[in-house]
């Protein structure tokens, strides 16, 4: 079976990309256990709790990220440089337990996957 990586690189609620990526991730987890999730660039904002999507008339899907553990999705990484660039602390309690990696280490980890889906 191919190893599949899901890369979240867009901010939540501005487009449907994050919600669609999460839906695809959960659906794919029913078919394979060999997948991982990466949060880079503005995608790191997907990890923040306390968002108020109703203020922009968007659906609150961020809480659904908390289900990753129930779906046995345990390989989650976040780009440490992206966090710093956006003024976020790696010690922030995110909705998903994601391991911070520097950009080079994150690229090396991502290279281990056969299929990369970016949202």
Curated annotation (Swiss-Prot):
Subcellular localization: Cytoplasm
Gene3D superfamilies in the record: DsrEFH-like
InterPro entries: DsrEFH-like, Sulphur_relay_DsrE/F-like, Sulphur_relay_TusC, Sulphur_relay_TusC/DsrF
Gene Ontology BP terms: tRNA processing
Recorded family membership: Belongs to the DsrF/TusC family.
Annotated HAMAP family: Thiourid_synth_C
Entries under PANTHER family matching the protein: PROTEIN TUSC (PTHR38780:SF1)
Protein name: Protein TusC
